[in-house]
């Protein structure tokens, strides 16, 4: 009997996770099936009860459930608690365990491009939502020199930067306009918002007029693969990191938690790229 895995979110019609995971099940000869379940917020508790009843072996959690899912799990690991969000759930002996692979998945994609030590990095994170919190938490763990949060709502950025502050990493908050004026002081800039995602591909989270060519510019969006934000950064001579690496890495880490098997990340990447027409 096939082992059932899935994705809980709303909406989920755009998700490429089923394609990626089902291909890996096939390649690794693992008797599993992954399905995306569209779950409205009011139905989340019932969906989790359904997952237990169906004896699902594990599932991913996406927008808008990453925070509220924590109320319905038996245990949440330390990093997910610190982040305040769960994106991966594993069933063990009838108990549901929550983890977060977003931050580590992103970190691994960033390490492919950032070659200087993390304690020398001054990072600007655009956005203050769940993805920003996952990334901020792992960057603090890596002891980056400073993290600045720029957000449309300054109060939210201030609250988040206060949570991140540590003895090794100084944290501050800026408005988007203030961040634009200080852009040249950052060595890494990360867009964690949905600004620039298909179909609004001409939008940018902020102006890159003051960007230094020494800066690494990263966007979590992977559709389109190269956002206008990344395109303009590249034109200014900066190194860029698209969102595909994080998407593949967080999926691969979840796959390992569920199955104990290590999927081929390059094949996962190619599978998603083909679907995106890349």
From Swiss-Prot:
Uppermost EC category: oxidoreductase
EC assignment: 1.1.1.25
Oligomeric form and interacting partners: Homodimer.
Binding site for shikimate: 15-17, 62, 87, 102, 222
Binding site for NADP(+): 78, 127-131, 151-156, 220, 243
Pfam families with a match to the protein in the record: SDH_C, Shikimate_DH, Shikimate_dh_N
Active-site positions on this chain: 66 (proton acceptor)
GO cellular component terms, semicolon-separated: cytosol
GO biological process assignments: amino acid biosynthetic process; aromatic amino acid family biosynthetic process; chorismate biosynthetic process; shikimate metabolic process
Pathway assignment: Metabolic intermediate biosynthesis; chorismate biosynthesis; chorismate from D-erythrose 4-phosphate and phosphoenolpyruvate: step 4/7
Name of the protein described by the UniProt record: Shikimate dehydrogenase (NADP(+))
Alphabetical list of InterPro entries matching this protein: Aminoacid_DH-like_N_sf (IPR046346), NAD(P)-bd_dom_sf (IPR036291), SDH_C (IPR041121), Shikimate_DH (IPR011342), Shikimate_DH-bd_N (IPR013708), Shikimate_DH_fam (IPR022893), Shikm_DH/Glu-tRNA_Rdtase (IPR006151)
Species: Halalkalibacterium halodurans (strain ATCC BAA-125 / DSM 18197 / FERM 7344 / JCM 9153 / C-125)
A GO molecular-function annotation: NADP binding
Purpose of the protein: Involved in the biosynthesis of the chorismate, which leads to the biosynthesis of aromatic amino acids. Catalyzes the reversible NADPH linked reduction of 3-dehydroshikimate (DHSA) to yield shikimate (SA).
NCBIfam families named among the record's database cross-references: aroE, PRK00258.3-3
Lineage start: Bacteria, Bacillati, Bacillota, Bacilli, Bacillales
Gene3D superfamilies hit by this protein: Leucine Dehydrogenase, chain A, domain 1, NAD(P)-binding Rossmann-like Domain
Keywords: Amino-acid biosynthesis, Aromatic amino acid biosynthesis, NADP, Oxidoreductase
Family: Belongs to the shikimate dehydrogenase family.
Reaction(s) catalysed (UniProt annotation): shikimate + NADP(+) = 3-dehydroshikimate + NADPH + H(+)
